[in-house]
UniProtKB/Swiss-Prot annotation:
Keyword terms, alphabetized: Cell cycle, Nucleus, Repressor, Transcription, Transcription regulation
Source organism phylogeny: Eukaryota, Viridiplantae, Streptophyta, Embryophyta, Tracheophyta
Family: Belongs to the retinoblastoma protein (RB) family.
Region (Disordered): 644-665
One biological process term in Gene Ontology: regulation of transcription by RNA polymerase II
Region named Pocket: 406-856
Entry GO terms, CC: nucleus
Protein name: Retinoblastoma-related protein
Length: 1007
């Protein structure tokens, strides 16, 4: 924060301070201690309110930014003061406030708050560190709270749909099944009771941030309680005639088995959760339980009573109101002094507080317009097209087959894969895997087993992450949960490791895999990948990626080396989990591998020695990987919320020394394209990978173990090339692929020429190869956006940065902080006398850093400087530290796309079939080519059928052809040609709803 800090005038500053005081004193009625803390943070950060970079928060209006700023300050103070001695002395005072109260006073909604919070964190982070200590970000738990909100939004809708399926609100069947909430805002007391009981279950039986699968099991147990106790006059079903209830012998319908069948949950887990739910009812509501088999109630008619507990007066009209009040008070006490979300908001009808639009949480999102993915640039072998049938087990079969999958049902499906495919496997290496382990120079079986136990214990500790104090049943349940997740990850690890060893032995024609099986980093990457899939399946809020990297001691670059192999060698992996791994690799490529502490830099300084000075000056090298003994000692010494091993959090501070840290990536055996999705459980739209011509695909792939060899070791498959050089070249080719997808999306959205696309693509490649340091500590999209504007300026195009940013906002991968917060090291820039490091807006970065470095390259590509087609090899630059290294990827024209989708169903006729759902259509089809397509159930014109649309489309494509009433498959002239389909199938990113906020309100930069 060494940049210029413009401060408002004394008069303006006094007015802002007065409004903040009013906000705290009258709006939230803060006590003196909390107000003093809030005022201190306000005074420390007040100068930031007047900076131009903050004007883009919210709608860009100063008053709007001010309200956000006030809310951020109060949220930070509330969260970070928890657990302090001063706060503990206050106890459960009456001045407690939570996030919802802050937002009501500031007139903001939850979605917008979490969207803008990252900007505050980036700007005020150093101040928060000074005031609250280095662990402030962990204690703030902003990402966890956001993911928790997303999960609860999904769960509340799931619960509402389920409630409407079984109950009415008026004692008779509902005529309108769209909402539990009536026009007057009334919510059924039974519906409210169920949600409050669910919240009590989360507070007393689950940990604070429980995973989605466990919470879904909890909701199913709540449904069982409601079915057993809500008066039958409110049922919208009958036990004997409801087709989705399975029967069990002569005793009647097995309620829990039926509900588990409907909602794809584990019956064993739901029965255990049911016990916890009954205990909450006994402990909090003081109701007396009795065995259902010993009770006589009309509610129990035709239900098998075995194993069920019944509470005589639980939902009697006389006691329901009292029970709701007790649950309300219990929840109030639980959240009083925690600045968390008041989870009752989901049944209070406060839509204005909830907000609308897209908000991601882990691998999930809530969105009106589903977030699409940029294709992941991984030269991985295609396993199956996502257009092909899903091979994972239990995909919404039976009665569910006609239901559109929801985030919850999809999560339960992947959980079923773990339960049915992975859980039955042995928890130790199989005989085949042991054969490989014992065939090494020394038997490594015991080492592999010990490492798996230590690493997975670090990822899934017996005490929940971040818990201040967990006692009783919640602690026991977390311990059991962690043990189950460890076993699932371990079994998956052994299974995939065996498959990899088998494949590697075939490549090497030998069973001795000592180099691979004794490599510590390889095994940790495999364990991290296995654990991440388990965490992604259960949607664990407290272990959002990249938490597994921190706890295993590996870096993003390390993990990127095993993802594609992991996918390829686990054929049963559900499609959603494949997409999750692919989305992680995209995140690694776009920014994480460029962050400080990435082991990529350890390979880069070997492959390109001229960059070592800059890498060392910025302190970018990875720290040595912590030893297994260090991790084991930390586990034994840990108790609850202790932070991870210190070295896992300080990878950026010192260079790595282990030879295997700088592990180069192996060449893949197949460079075909793969369809992937980013948001695993939101039915995202699938884009395709680009096939690049600059990869040396004709060379045989080296064995997997060479990927983890020392960077300085010669690569036996590439004469005269070190493993580091091979790895960096492959890594760069993947970056270029990802950039090609994103460049193409922006060109389509901006409606630019194909020549402009070629030029931007060429410039990006040249920057990557000749000005590599521009990527350090930055996001590749920041470079892409600058490439667009730089070429537009030099080509004298009428394209402003404002237009570029406005259209970039509509791209699926857009996050506001990408163009609002770009890393700058002024000491290396030597501009304007500035020193130090800070984050600036993208226009400042463009003017001060990008243009001085890239201007010569722009001149080469711009008018009069040649075109991409004339430049097959990047010219060497004398005395340039970023000069292209030997044998780096050559500059290539923009890649052509493989003919993958729609699928050609006839070799004789030009007929293509694409089983698109309507939710996926928009992003696959560009604005310019949308009129060529018709999707079942949608029309290109009002009040027309798809069959008429097909005729209309063919008429437009063949204007000289006579009108036909139906498609004639014998007449090629009447059908869409191959060339037209190929031309139309450039990767498009669709029309995603623009994120809130205005474009940058800054002057256009000058070159």
């Amino acid at each position: 924060m060494d940049g210029v800090k413009p401060v408002a005038s004394a008069e303006q500053g006094g007015a802002v301070e007065a409004r903040f005081t009013e906000f705290c004193k009258n709006g939230l009625q803060l006590d003196e201690s909390t107000f003093a803390q809030a005022m201190k943070l306000f005074e420390e950060s007040n100068h930031l309110l007047s900076t131009t970079s903050l004007s883009a928060i919210g709608n860009g209006v100063p008053e709007d930014s001010e309200r956000y700023w006030f809310a951020f300050i109060l949220y930070s103070v509330k969260r970070l003061s928890e657990g302090t001695a001063e706060n503990v002395q206050q106890g459960n005072d009456e001045n407690g406030f939570n996030l919802c109260q802050i937002l009501r006073v500031s007139k903001l909604n939850i979605v917008d708050f979490f969207k803008e919070l990252p900007q505050f964190i980036v700007k005020v982070g150093p101040i928060l560190g000074n005031l609250y200590g280095p662990d402030w970000e962990k204690r703030l738990e902003a990402k966890e709270l956001q993911a928790n909100f997303v999960h609860l939004s999904i769960l509340s809708k799931y619960y509402k749909r389920a409630y409407l399926e079984f109950f009415s609100t008026s004692g008779s069947n509902l005529d309108k099944q769209s909402s539990v909430i009536s026009a007057s805002g009334y919510v059924s007391d039974y519906h409210r009771f169920g949600w409050l009981l669910f919240l009590a279950l989360r507070v007393h039986a689950f940990s604070r941030f429980k995973d989605l699968v466990t919470c879904t099991n909890g909701l199913v147990s709540i449904l069982a309680i409601l079915i057993l106790h809500v008066p039958i006059s409110f049922r919208s079903f009958t036990i004997n005639n409801y087709p989705r209830f399975v029967k069990k012998g002569n005793k009647g319908m097995d309620l829990l088995a039926s509900l588990c069948d409907i909602y794809e949950t584990s019956e064993d887990e739901v029965r255990k959760t049911m016990e916890q739910t009954n205990k909450v009812i006994v402990d909090i509501l003081k109701k007396k339980p009795c065995l259902a088999s010993e009770c006589k109630s009309e509610n129990l008619a035709s239900i098998d009573p075995d194993g069920l507990v019944y509470f005589e007066d639980l939902m009697d009209e006389s006691s329901l109101s009292s029970s709701i009040n007790i649950l309300e008070k219990d929840y109030d006490a639980a959240i009083r002094n925690k600045g968390e979300l008041d989870e009752r908001v989901f049944i209070n009808g406060e839509d204005s507080l909830l907000g609308s639009g897209s908000l991601s949480g882990g691998a999930m999102s809530i969105s009106g317009a589903k977030r699409k993915i940029d294709s992941l640039a991984s030269p991985a072998k295609t396993i199956t097209s996502p257009l092909s049938p899903n091979r994972s087990p239990g995909i919404l079969g039976g009665a569910n087959s006609k239901m559109a999958p929801t985030p919850v049902t999809t999560a339960m499906t992947t959980a079923k894969w773990l339960r049915t495919v992975i859980s039955p496997l042995p928890s130790k290496p199989s005989a085949e895997l042991e054969r490989f382990l014992t065939s090494c120079d020394k038997d490594v079986t015991s080492d592999v087993i010990r490492r798996a136990n230590v690493i997975l214990e670090a990822i899934f500790p017996s005490i929940a992450f971040g818990e201040r104090c967990v006692t009783g049943s919640a602690s026991l349940m977390d311990s059991i949960w962690a043990q189950q997740r460890r076993m699932e990850a371990m079994k998956l690890y052994y299974r995939v490791l065996e498959a990899m060893c088998t494949a590697e032995a075939q490549v090497l024609h030998a069973n001795n895999l000592t180099s691979l099986l004794t490599n510590e980093r390889f095994h940790r990457c495999m364990l991290a990948c296995s654990a991440e899939l388990v965490l992604a399946t259960h949607k664990t809020v407290t272990m959002l990626f990249p938490a597994v990297l921190e706890r295993t001691g590996i870096t993003a670059f390390d993990l990127s080396k095993v993802i594609e192999s992991f996918i390829r060698h686990e054929e049963s992996l559900p499609r959603e989990l494949r997409r999750h791994l692919n989305s992680l690799e995209e995140r690694l490529l776009e920014s994480m591998v460029w962050e400080k502490g990435s082991s990529m830099y350890n390979s880069l300084i070997v492959a390109r020695a001229a960059l070592s000075a800059e890498v060392n000056r910025l302190g970018l090298l990875a720290e040595p990987m912590p030893s297994l003994d260090a991790i084991s000692m930390h586990i034994n010494a840990s108790c609850g919320g202790l932070p991870p091993v210190p070295s896992l959090q300080k990878r950026e501070s010192s260079p790595g020394q282990n030879g295997d840290i700088r592990s180069p990536k192996r060449v893949c055996p197949d460079y075909r394209s793969v369809l992937v999705e980013r948001n695993s459980f939101t039915s995202p739209v699938k884009d395709r990978f680009l096939a690049l011509n600059n990869l040396k695909s004709k060379l045989p792939p080296p064995p997997l173990q060479s990927a983890f060899a020392s960077p300085t070791r010669p690569n036996p498959g590439r004469e005269g090339e070190t493993c580091a050089e091979t790895g960096i070249n492959i890594f760069f080719s993947k970056i270029i692929k990802l950039a090609a997808v994103r460049i193409n999306g922006m060109v389509e959205r901006l409606q630019l020429s194909q020549q402009m696309r070629e030029n931007v693509y060429c410039l990006f490649q040249q920057i990557l190869n000749r000005r590599t340091s521009l990527f350090f500590n930055r996001h590749i999209d920041q470079i892409i956006l600058c490439c667009f504007y730089g070429l537009a300026k030099i080509s004298q195009m009428n394209l402003t940065f404002r237009e570029i940013i406005h259209n970039y906002r509509k791209q699926p991968q857009c996050k506001p902080q990408i163009f609002r917060s770009v890393f700058v090291d002024w000491s290396s820039a030597r501009r304007n006398g500035k020193t130090g490091k800070e984050h600036v807006d993208i226009i400042t970065f463009y003017n001060e850093i990008f243009i001085p470095a890239v201007k010569p390259l722009l001149m080469e590509i711009g008018p009069g400087g040649g075109t991409t087609t004339k430049t097959n090899r990047v010219p060497e630059v004398n005395n340039n530290n970023d000069a292209q290294c030997p044998e780096s990827p050559k500059i290539s024209p923009f890649p052509s796309l493989p003919d993958m989708s729609p699928k050609k169903v006839s070799a004789a006729h030009n007929v293509y079939v694409s089983p698109l759902r309507s939710s996926k259509m928009d992003a696959l089809i560009s604005h310019s080519s949308k009129s060529y397509y018709a999707c079942v159930g949608e029309s290109t014109h009002a009040y027309q059928s798809p069959s008429k649309d097909l005729t209309a489309i063919n008429n437009r494509l063949n204007s000289t052809r006579k009108l036909r009433g139906a498609l004639n498959f014998d007449d090629v002239e009447g059908l869409v040609s191959d060339s037209l389909v190929a031309k139309s199938l450039y990767l498009q990113n669709g029309s995603c709803a623009s994120s809130s906020g205005a474009p940058l309100k800054l002057e256009q930069p000058d070159t």
